[in-house]
Each structure stands twice: as structure tokens, then as C-alpha cells.
Swiss-Prot record:
Domain of life: Bacteria
Gene giving rise to this polypeptide: rplC
InterPro entries from the UniProt entry: Ribosomal_uL3 (IPR000597), Ribosomal_uL3_bac/org-type (IPR019927), Ribosomal_uL3_CS (IPR019926), Transl_B-barrel_sf (IPR009000)
Family, per entry: Belongs to the universal ribosomal protein uL3 family.
UniProt name for this protein: Large ribosomal subunit protein uL3
Ranges for region Disordered: 125-168
Transmembrane residue ranges: none
Length: 218
């Protein structure tokens, strides 16, 4: 049973299928993750599993977190994540969650922070068309109209404008696991995932599995 796992993006590569077609893949170093807490309906009101990933220096973790992590084993962990489950039977505090809990062909959802690109303009951030480049135009990469005048006398919230681009959490759904390497803690996932190499990723079984419905709901 795969509940979910934390990992680190290593980068992208490619595999060749049986027809010799190149398939883009992402290599993810996932786990091993330590089970740091088991939540039950009797004590917490719901059933869940909390896991930790990525050992870090002792001085970077405060005392409450150290006390919490000490209940599940030695060593402090940098990242924690919780997954809802139907039942925690069969799971043990201090146990390990590894890539062997996943299998090739399984669909997963991968969450992470997108690449931060800093302050960006209208064209780069939103894909706006630019203005004329010649004939005396000075409106090359400007936004154009941002709204009416005296009425409403303001710019409506949500107006697409220049600003910080990227660096936000997003989820890529329905990715297929092509290969599982238990010896090297690797997941080979078809396609791309959020973030740059070294970024933290949250991998969990897909919650939307099946063919997409046709337009009109038929």
C-alpha cells in the first residue's frame, strides 16, 4: 500500500520505448522516509500517517520538534508531511516508507514549488502580446489599458499585471511511474514535475484515476 512519500528532484532524462521513441522522464530520489506519527480516530478524530524526510543539523530544529521526532527514532528531520489513510493498522511508529511501496505503471500526483523567476513583466508572466515596435510607437512591452477612468476609479483585484513570477506551490496530476529502483531509492516518472533540480517533492497516489469524460458529460 502506497500512502505517499517525500523526495528530491534530481533532473530530467529520457527513456526509449519498444518502438524506439524517446520518452521524457524525471528522476526523483524518494525516501526513505521515517514514520514520525500515527493518528487515529480515537485520539485525533481522523486517521493519518506523518512521515519525515531529509536529515539536517541538530541546531536547526527547535526543542518541541526534537521531542516530537525523538518518539520515532534518532536523528532530526527537515521536512514533515501528513497523509490521510483509512486505517493505520500494519504501520509502525519509526518504520520506513520507501519507493518499494510504489510500482511501475502506477499513477501519482506530484506537488512542489515552481521555479522562481523573480519580478517579471506582462509578456513573460502572462503571455501578453507586445505593442508595435516601429512607426513611433512607445508602447512596446507595456500593459495597455488597465481599466476605465473616473468610474470605477480603481484597478479591479485580480488584474493581470507585472509581479513576482513562479515560486508557488503547484501539483502535476496523473503522472505515470515508468520504473522503480529500490536499491538507489529512485522513481522514474514520465513527464515533468514542478521545481528545479534539488527541489522538495511530495509524491502520492493519484486521486483522479481513469479516462477523461467526454465533453457534455457523456
Amino acid at each position: 500500500m502506497s500512502i505517499g512519500i517525500l523526495g528530491k528532484k534530481l533532473g530530467m532524462s529520457q527513456l526509449f520505448d519498444e518502438q524506439g521513441k524517446a520518452v521524457p522522464v524525471t528522476l526523483i530520489e524518494a525516501g526513505p522516509c521515517r514514520i514520525t506519527q500515527l493518528k487515529t480516530t480515537e485520539t485525533d478524530g481522523y486517521s493519518a500517517v506523518q512521515i519525515g524526510f531529509g536529515e539536517t543539523r541538530d541546531k536547526l530544529v527547535n526543542k518541541p520538534a526534537k521531542g516530537h521526532l525523538a518518539k520515532s527514532g534518532e536523528g532530526v528531520l527537515r521536512h514533515l508531511s501528513e497523509y490521510r489513510v483509512d486505517d493505520v493498522n500494519g504501520l509502525e511508529l519509526g518504520g520506513a516508507v520507501t519507493v518499494s511501496d510504489f510500482e511501475a505503471g502506477q499513477k501519482v500526483d506530484v506537488s512542489g514549488d515552481t521555479m522562481g523567476r523573480g519580478f517579471a513583466g506582462y509578456q513573460k508572466r502572462h503571455g501578453f502580446s507586445r505593442g508595435p515596435m516601429t512607426h513611433g510607437s512607445k508602447n512596446h512591452r507595456e500593459p495597455g489599458s488597465t481599466g476605465a477612468g473616473t468610474t470605477p476609479g480603481r484597478i479591479y483585484p485580480g488584474k493581470r499585471m507585472a509581479g513576482r513570477y513562479g515560486g508557488k506551490k503547484t501539483t502535476t496530476r496523473g503522472l505515470t511511474i515508468l520504473k522503480v529502483d529500490s536499491d538507489r531509492n529512485l522513481l522514474v516518472v514520465k513527464g515533468s514535475v514542478p521545481g528545479k533540480p534539488g527541489a522538495l517533492l511530495n509524491i502520492r497516489p493519484a486521486n483522479r484515476v481513469g479516462a477523461k469524460p467526454a465533453k457534455g458529460g457523456k
